[in-house]
Each structure stands twice: as structure tokens, then as C-alpha cells.
Amino acid sequence: MFAHTALRQRCAKWLFATGLFLLLGACVEKPSTLERVKEDGVLRVITRNSPATYFQDRNGETGFEYELVKRFADDLGVKLEIETADNLDELFDDLGKPSGPVLAAAGLVNSERRKTQARFSHPYLEVTPQVIYRNGRSRPTDPKGLVGKKIMVLKGSSHADQLAELKRRYPGLEYEESDAVEVVDLLRMVDEGQIDLTLVDSNELAMNQVYFPNVRVAFDLGETRNQRWAVAPGEDNSLLNEVNEFLDKSQKNGTLQRLKDRYYGHVDVLGYVGAYTFAQHLQQRLPKYEKYFKSYAKVEQVDWRLLAAIGYQESLWQPEVTSKTGVRGLMMLTQRTAQAMGVSNRLDPRQSIKGGAKYFMLVKQQLDDSIKEPDRTWFALAAYNVGSGHLEDARTLAKREKLNPNKWLDVKKMLPRLSQKQWYRQTKYGYARGGEPVHFVANIRRYYDILTWVTQPQLEGQVAEGNLHVPGVNKDKPAEQSPPM
């Protein structure tokens, strides 16, 4: 009996200890989302692959949302890990999954359909939803004018919500939601007349309109709205509170304004200047830097006139120019490229030309050996502009289309596809402003041809006297499109 009593006492003690252990375990709080981010040392963010959010160019990762969320990660003292979603439904589905992204930074607008899927931050960017049509076609001036039009918008977007609301008032209104396109695709489809109308936010139109000369704003649909970041639903406010504090601080210290100005405060115009202006620059600007072009072209074994043409395309031979994106100097070098090329002062024209020449030849040497001249030079120019990764993506697309991946004439047809979702989603490096390198190469070839012509011994005197006639370019009239190549 004594043995049974002792056994019961030991069991009771064991049960008590076990219960106490479980009770104490239950009392230990799980780490918050913010604590987990800091412990892991990684902020996992989901976004969209588009010009206004996130993409890769020759300098690496970029985009308004990327730069802002990178600053947030730096503030937290953690690394940034980016994941891209094919569409908005996928983005919200993935947000908050175990080991998945904890934050969505993708130009999101709070809406009724999303309230149960996420919690939204304080606002950081005001945008206006705009109805877009093609110039020369019938322009709607109010919501009633949307009836009978072929309309497409992003699936799951706030614009789709707006149209759904309007359809209650105008039952004849029809529209299509697509998850196979991005904003750039929608603008292109309007520009080419494939659809009548689309809806985009004002910031995305500002970034892309230069590439689509036929698109116009029909009217603003509704009032200005706010873009926000999003976190997963739940009661853990740790990350959301930190996000709000960061966004409020960025608003006060001018960080947000600087980013807005950099991405949306200007319009990049691609094209080449009129012959009169170019002739003036040949006379007034080139002589100051010609010796540097010739000297470093000789070192790198490249035609100095090609190097000068690159410099003119980049800066119009202006040594102290700085772009909104942070590239500087006559050859418009990034800080990263300048450091790699041994350039300590990007505003020093001699150093800039030296660095630009060295970098161009480095890019050219890294091209596949199967690419031969003269195509090799045009490929190198494209890679210099958009990055080698995106150029390889275009070559891959060319192969799939049974085109020659070693011929510029074929690959330049594929580069613009890198801005179209149906194509860039198949590539390794994703979205790129694929039309830019095509214009970049075309412009430089034109400048190079002119420089080759005017540097003939019998014409150099005309340049010095300012009496130069440049063939093939309309005097004083900038071209709207690059010449055929």
C-alpha cells in the first residue's frame, strides 16, 4: 500500500510539473512579426514587376517602390528580399504565408474587396485614376461615355472596382479584367488601337507616356486616392506600426518628395536634336573634349567618334549634368560603375570619358563570342544602356521566335517585348524598358554617322567656321522617332 501511495505521489508530481511546464509555455509570447524580421535579418517584400514599382536595369534593382522599401529595410538594419507576383490576386494570397513575404509594396489602393485580405499603412503617394484613350478616336468626357467601348484593366485592381461600381449605374458598360498584362501592356494596347480605353493611375501614365505617343487622358475618374503598403491581416501591429512611423518620417524629412521628383517629376524624351543644334555643339562643345575621346579611344582600341557619339547621347557633351536617377557627368556614369572603373570624380570630363570608354569595352568583351561585328558593337551599346542580363533575355526570345540571336536587326525586335508582361514573365531578368536601348543604339548610330562624315579632312574647316550642313536630319526640327536602321 505504501508503494502504491508513493507511486500516486510521483505521478501527481509529474502531472503537476507537466501542467506547469505547459502553462508556462503558453504564457511565453510568440515573437512579433517585427521581432522575427529583425531576428532573421531579412525583410521579405512582395511587389509587382513594373516601371512604377520594381524592375532591374543596367544598374541593378530599381523602381519607386523598391527604393522606398529598401530605405525601410536599411532603417531596420536588415537585408531586403524581393518577390514579384504575376497579378494582384497572387500578391494578396502570398502576403503573410509562412516563410513568405510580410509586406506588400506595390502601389496599392485600399478597397472594399481587399479589406479582409490585408491591413494598409498610412498613405505615401497621391494618385488620380485616369481614363486613357487613343488620340484621333472618339474621346469620352464622362462615365456615361464608357458604354459601348472596349475596355481592359488589371484584374483585381482598384480600377476594376471602380468599373464594377459604375456598371450598377450604367448596365451597358462592359469591361475585361486581365491578369496576363501590366500597365505598360494596357497603354500599348490603347496606343496601337487594340482596345478603346483603359484606366491607369496618374503616376504610371507620367512614367510611360513618352513611349506611347498616341495615348491621351480622356478624363479623371473620381477623386485623388492614396497608395499604401499592406501587411497581412491579424492582431499583430508591430510591423504595421513600424511602417507607419517610417512613412511619416520619410514624409517629414523630404525622402518621399525626393523620390517622387526623381521618378515622376520629369519626362525623359528620347530622340535626337536638330542639325543646327548639333552643328553648334560640334563647334562649341566637342573641341573641349575631343583630345580625351581620342586619347582613351586609342587606349581601349575603339573608334573615338563612336565614343563621342555615346557621350553626346548621354549628356550632349555637358560634363556637369546630373540626371534624376543619380547618374552624372559627360558619360553619365552611375556611382557603382564609376567606382569599378576607377573614376573618383564623375564630373571631371577626362575621368568620365576614361571610365566610359573602359566600361563600354568591358561590356563589349563580355558578349558571347558568337556575336560578330558590326552587330557586336550595336549589342554592346544596348547592353551599355539596359544591362547585359536584359540583352540576353532578348536574345533568348529571338531564339524562340526562330530569329538570329546574333543579329541586331532581329534582337532589336525582341527588346521592346521586355516591357510586355506576356513576354518578360518568361525571362530571367524580368521587366525592362526595352524600347530604350533600341532608341539609344539608333541615336548613337546617327550621331556616329554624322561625326564620321564631318571629320573628313575636307570638312573639318567647315565645322570650325560653323558653316556645317549635316545631311539626313531636318534642320532645327527634333525627330519624334529614331531613324530606321
From Swiss-Prot:
Residues 30-267 are annotated as: Non-LT domain. PROSITE patterns: TRANSGLYCOSYLASE (PS00922). Murein-degrading enzyme that degrades murein glycan strands and insoluble, high-molecular weight murein sacculi, with the concomitant formation of a 1,6-anhydromuramoyl product. Lytic transglycosylases (LTs) play an integral role in the metabolism of the peptidoglycan (PG) sacculus. Their lytic action creates space within the PG sacculus to allow for its expansion as well as for the insertion of various structures such as secretion systems and flagella. The keyword S-adenosyl-L-methionine does not apply. HAMAP family: MltF. Residues 1-29 form the signal peptide. InterPro entries: Lysozyme-like_dom_sf, MltF, Solute-binding_3/MltF_N, Transglyc_AS, Transglycosylase_SLT_dom_1. Residues 465-485 are annotated as: Disordered. It is a peripheral membrane protein. It holds the Pfam family SBP_bac_3. The active site is at residue 314. GO terms for cellular component: cell outer membrane. It is found in: Cell outer membrane. Its main location: membrane. One of its GO terms (biological process) is cell wall organization. Its EC number is 4.2.2.n1. GO terms for molecular function: peptidoglycan lytic transglycosylase activity. This is Membrane-bound lytic murein transglycosylase F. Residues 268-485 are annotated as: LT domain. The N-terminal domain does not have lytic activity and probably modulates enzymatic activity. The C-terminal domain is the catalytic active domain. In the N-terminal section; belongs to the bacterial solute-binding protein 3 family. In the C-terminal section; belongs to the transglycosylase Slt family. It catalyses: Exolytic cleavage of the (1->4)-beta-glycosidic linkage between N-acetylmuramic acid (MurNAc) and N-acetylglucosamine (GlcNAc) residues in peptidoglycan, from either the reducing or the non-reducing ends of the peptidoglycan chains, with concomitant formation of a 1,6-anhydrobond in the MurNAc residue. NCBIfam families: PRK10859.1. Keywords: Cell outer membrane, Cell wall biogenesis/degradation, Lyase, Membrane, Signal.
